[in-house]
């Protein structure tokens, strides 16, 4: 287990941190940063974001009386230092491991994790709700939301600020401005924040006036009114344009150096006494303190395990060619298709490297768009493109598509527009946990009229489904879901073939039991059949490809021949693929024993994908066991 520094090891709670002399905080920060480097290099995890807020994390817990004062982290990639300072240092080596600490703040894990996070742009809304509740209950608490400039591009953050500005709630928004999300930040807001950081005249003169008057709370309402008038005059005369946050009635302070710990402590102490909603703009460097991470912030967002001295990232080596990641199949295939079809466009909400649309952005910059953390906009922007005869491929992680459900229905499917949704990270997201699992898309998509819902079993099917979806004769909305991680076919670049919409395929014949699978999880069925071969059990296997329209012709054949049927999916059982099969059985008056394997009706925590598949009973061994049980075979 990694050992912390001599001062850090004495801190098991923020209460102990607050007992230190302020002069000791720099040492705490240095040891905290090193502890993060030591742990992530050995165990993996999100890296650069947490390094960038070490000083801010120490200052917040030093100044505010957490957990009485409530601290909300947006997304949570940057919260490792927070976890270490709040009693989880000794268990931090279990971070993002099965049955270990969550990689994100989680209410059930610690009272210091006041709000569970994982998706972006939620912190201001949550902290404002807490602040209004405290005000109603007459609790004298501070409420702090820490949000990055990337997350600030999400519309929900602006909805929250719009509301906060008409309250007098005790809310402090700390803007962690590092010009990055996972990829470099995009959009006009980025340029606006850069303008603020360079307009220092207003901030310098205002600081001089404040220093002259002293801390306004010491002088009573008259001095406060004078200071307010002086400040208003400064704004009018020195700012070229009105401050966005001030226009929303949120008092703006900054920008300040987010790595100047002593100054942060001073500023945060001052802000504690200023009532109403306010924002502190801090400038930080993502990856601060680890030179390689500062230099390449995208690569070091979550690099995996690495040599902390050399920076060499540990990558598995193989003697034989390996299958690609599904995201790379998408990234290369959309370029191939776009080279032949000039109507194809690519859209992603802030995940270009994660979904590999960055390949198209580099090669065809006028046809590929990173629209920021804005899933709702991404979908309706795609719909707008489609109205003009273009063919948008809108790539959104399955878990983030939840945020744009209304737009899929209202803006795309009701109008039957030719938008192609590529849902990356469908199924279990692994160690990122329940906030990132893509468990629900099959269920929430298959109930929408006009929408084709498909899932490839391998890389070739992904390519061919993408090819099929963009054909002009297929004018309606089309979705393709595929998992995180590696495929199964090293030689995947084969000529395109059109797939008949709504038609599955028989993978293998068999006797007695039929297994119907959807998507990549069908490869587990192949492994299960191999396990059963020595037992002379040979279930038939059907790769259905489509949940909607489902292949009714194939289902008729299956139900006429087999009375024992297993469905397998890496999505939620309620309303999913297996439910569609049961609906078909009921509607057509078939009688059969049907066992559904998939994600049960509960929140599944984090762990490696294989661990979670086993837990939920649809790994190869569990599938084989289900076949044995249906066949009445008992292992000796």
From Swiss-Prot:
* Free-text cofactor note: Binds 1 Mg(2+) ion per subunit.
Write down the Pfam families for this protein, in alphabetical order: DXP_synthase_N (PF13292), Transket_pyr (PF02779), Transketolase_C (PF02780)
Catalysed reaction(s)?
A: D-glyceraldehyde 3-phosphate + pyruvate + H(+) = 1-deoxy-D-xylulose 5-phosphate + CO2
The organism's taxonomy opens as: Bacteria, Pseudomonadati, Bacteroidota, Cytophagia, Cytophagales
Q: Which GO terms describe its biological process?
A: 1-deoxy-D-xylulose 5-phosphate biosynthetic process; isopentenyl diphosphate biosynthetic process, methylerythritol 4-phosphate pathway; terpenoid biosynthetic process; thiamine biosynthetic process
Check the record and name the InterPro entries matching this protein: Dxylulose-5-P_synthase (IPR005477), THDP-binding (IPR029061), Transketo_C/PFOR_II (IPR009014), Transketolase-like_Pyr-bd (IPR005475), Transketolase_BS (IPR020826), Transketolase_C (IPR033248), Transketolase_CS (IPR049557)
Function, please?
Catalyzes the acyloin condensation reaction between C atoms 2 and 3 of pyruvate and glyceraldehyde 3-phosphate to yield 1-deoxy-D-xylulose-5-phosphate (DXP).
Q: What is this protein called?
A: 1-deoxy-D-xylulose-5-phosphate synthase
Q: Which organism is it from?
A: Cytophaga hutchinsonii (strain ATCC 33406 / DSM 1761 / CIP 103989 / NBRC 15051 / NCIMB 9469 / D465)
Q: Does the keyword tRNA-binding apply?
A: no
């Amino acid at each position: 287990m990694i050992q912390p520094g001599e001062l850090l090891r004495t801190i098991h709670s923020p209460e102990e941190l607050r007992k230190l002399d302020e002069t000791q905080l720099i040492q705490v920060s240095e040891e905290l940063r090193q502890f993060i480097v030591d742990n992530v290099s050995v165990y993996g995890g999100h890296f650069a974001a947490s390094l960038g807020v070490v000083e801010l994390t120490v200052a917040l817990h030093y100044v505010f009386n957490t957990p009485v004062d409530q601290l909300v982290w947006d997304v949570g990639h940057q919260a490792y230092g927070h976890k270490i300072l709040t009693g989880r240092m000794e268990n931090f080596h279990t971070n993002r491991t099965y049955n270990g600490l969550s990689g994100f703040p989680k209410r059930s894990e610690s009272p210091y994790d006041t709000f569970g996070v994982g998706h972006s742009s939620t912190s201001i809304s949550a902290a404002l709700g807490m602040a209004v509740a405290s005000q109603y209950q007459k609790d004298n608490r501070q409420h702090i939301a820490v949000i990055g400039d990337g997350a600030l591009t999400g519309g929900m953050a602006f909805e929250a600020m719009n509301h906060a500005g008409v309250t007098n709630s005790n809310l402090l928004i700390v803007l962690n401005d590092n010009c990055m999300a996972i990829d470099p930040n995009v959009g006009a807001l980025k340029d606006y924040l850069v303008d603020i950081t360079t307009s220092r005249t207003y901030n310098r003169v205002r600081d001089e006036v404040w220093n002259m008057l002293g801390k306004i709370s010491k002088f009573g309402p008259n001095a406060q009114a004078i200071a307010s008038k002086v400040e208003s005059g400064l704004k009018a005369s020195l700012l070229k344009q009105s401050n966005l946050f001030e226009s929303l009635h949120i008092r703006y302070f900054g920008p300040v150096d987010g790595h100047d710990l002593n100054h942060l402590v001073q500023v945060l102490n001052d802000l504690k006494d200023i009532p109403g909603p306010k924002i502190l703009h801090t400038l930080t460097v993502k990856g601060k303190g680890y030179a390689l991470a500062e230099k390449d912030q995208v690569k070091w967002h979550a690099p995996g395990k690495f040599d902390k001295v050399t920076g060499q990232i540990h990558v598995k080596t193989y003697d034989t060619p390996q299958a690609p990641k599904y995201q790379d199949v998408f990234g290369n295939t959309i370029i191939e298709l776009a080279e032949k079809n000039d109507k194809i466009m690519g859209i992603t909400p802030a995940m270009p490297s994660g979904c590999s649309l960055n390949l198209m952005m580099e090669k065809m910059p006028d046809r590929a768009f990173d629209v920021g953390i804005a899933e709702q906009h991404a979908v309706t922007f795609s719909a707008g493109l489609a109205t003009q005869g273009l063919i948008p491929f809108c790539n959104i992680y399955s878990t983030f598509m939840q945020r744009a459900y209304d737009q899929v229905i209202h803006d795309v499917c009701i109008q039957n527009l030719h938008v192609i949704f590529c849902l990356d990270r469908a199924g279990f997201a692994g160690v990122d946990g329940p906030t990132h699992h893509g468990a629900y898309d099959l269920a929430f998509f298959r109930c929408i009229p006009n929408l084709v819902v498909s899932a490839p079993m391998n890389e070739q099917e992904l390519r061919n489904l993408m090819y099929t979806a963009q054909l002009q004769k297929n004018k309606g909305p089309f979705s393709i879901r595929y998992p995180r991680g590696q495929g199964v076919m090293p030689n995947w670049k084969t000529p395109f073939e059109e797939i008949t919409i709504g038609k599955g395929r028989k993978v293998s014949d068999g006797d007695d039991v039929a297994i119907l699978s959807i998507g990549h999880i069908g490869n587990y069925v192949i492994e299960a059949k191999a396990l059963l071969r020595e037992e002379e059990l040979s279930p038939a296997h059907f790769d259905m490809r489509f949940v909607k329209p489902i292949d009714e012709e194939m289902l008729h054949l299956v139900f006429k021949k087999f009375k024992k049927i297993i469905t397998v999916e890496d999505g939620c059982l309620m309303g999913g693929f297996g439910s569609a099969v049961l609906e078909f059985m009921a509607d057509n008056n078939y009688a059969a024993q049907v066992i559904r394997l998939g994600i049960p009706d509960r929140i599944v925590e984090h762990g490696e994908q294989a661990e979670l598949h086993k837990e939920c009973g649809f790994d190869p061994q569990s599938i084989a066991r289900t076949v044995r049980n249906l066949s009445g075979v008992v292992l000796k």
